[in-house]
Amino acid sequence: MASLATKALALIALLVATVVTADAHDERLGAVTFPTSCAPTVQAQFERAVALQHSFWFGEAIKGFNAVAQADPSCGIAHWGAAVAWLGNPLAGPPTPRGLAEGSAAVARARSAGAKTERERDYIAAIETFYKDHDKTDHKTRAVAYEKAMEALARKYPTDREAAIFYALALNVTLNPNDKTYANQLKAAAVLEKIFAEQPEHPGVAHYLIHSYDFPPIAPKGVTAARRYAQIAPSAPHALHMPSHIFTRLGYWQESIETNRRSAEIAKAELRQTNLEAGSYNALHAMDYIAYAALQLARDRDARAIVDEVRALNKIDSEQFAAAFAFAAIPARYALERRAWGEAAELALHPKSLSWAKFPQAESINAFARGLGAARGGNLAAAKQEVTRLSSLAYAMATAKNAYWAEQSEIQKLAVSAWIARGEGRNDEALALMRQAADREDATEKHPVTPGAIQPAREMLGELLLELGQPAKALAELEASQKIDPNRLHGLAAAARAADAAGDRAKAKSYATRLLDLTKTADSERPEIVNAKAFVGAN
């Protein structure tokens, strides 16, 4: 049962919500209420740090929590905040070794400082369940233990909305990527939707609702949160990026470009204040989404500008997985979406200074792009070398118990192997391999780090069937792919061709018209656009 003092604090919180602002810069981070027993003079500063944390601005959040602890050494809950921030993006994977060390130290400082209320001590104990024995217990086990601790905390203090919000985030961290009922996600969303109605300016609620709905069948439920989040916390780079998770799911490419451009600009501006030579991993993450969206609109010059900017970077401000992923994905997407097979086959890992061995799941993208480019470009020997490389990377990830990404590499290997089989005339085997890749990809979910598969396997299956003279079957696969990845340029183009070849001129014209509408701001004359114009003009 929550104490009367805690209930009183919660009541005060409902009456007086702190809108987090910074006078010097007119900072807008949203409205957060987190009552504490710390000195009243640090309360607003503490809530600002919590708001920064809810928008995944980890470095600034850590600075904020540490400043609170320095101003009020007895404020143990400030060290709790730092420990939470040192997790980094919990949806992207485990913390870095430094994050684990710093987070553990923050928990120890929280214990030493001594929180004045049972509620605050419970928060500290909850985060301690994640860091405890991190050198002996695997990440997943500790993440689940933390989720259960936050569930207990939220139940113990039913009027404490922050406890419920952090619990909802924990549910998204521990979700089963193979669960197509989306049990954890919908459970989290139910918690968050209730709070969203009460606190429509809360950054964490909108943020975590987007993550909860970031899955094809339920993505439309996230539109409201997506459109609100950037308005709630426009000073935070991640808040400007996050709406694009939903926009991408629904094929709203221009909206994705616009919100990610703002996100990247803020992230790069922040970095320029401290480091003029390194790239920002926050900006790179947004730039991957921009490039992906621009390529769907055939805005190839816009995408090329992103590629050139990435290639000019020789180091990164923080070796985060999101940065490594973007470094590998952006040039791969640029080559493959333009069907520049030779260019894809020659892609090199960049920058060389990055510790690529730490990120085999990112290196796998490079191997996939090189392999697919070589296979479809006719260099089957080179493609087979990349299949071997993908096998090694998948094995390394499986050995490290990184099952999700090991499976993604296996799917990539199957796809490249399918096109190799096609190149060698083993057409039945090619179809079997590609269907296996598509089915296995459908059985998993997109990771939050990526706007989408580098090349969707079911879309490739449709293209392969079309190439092998089976247009009706191709159309069925392409339409299924569009349900998962709507408004993809190549998906629409292939569907138009398949429908035409299958004798359905009306459907072919519909897809071709959609393609032309999609690419009306194109800055390149892709063959797909030329063909669609000719078809629509003749029909």
Each PLM stretch: what is its role?
Residues K7-V19:
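Bacterial N-terminal signal peptides
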Residues D23-T159, F166-A236, L240-R249, A267-I290, ...:
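Short coil/linker segments at helix-helix boundaries
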Residues G76, A83-L87, P95-A115, T248, ...:
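TPR/TPR-like (Sel1-like) alpha-helical repeat modules
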Residues Q412, A430-Q482:
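Generic long, charged, amphipathic alpha-helical segments
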Residues M460-K533:
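C-terminal structured "cap/appendage" subdomains that terminate the fold
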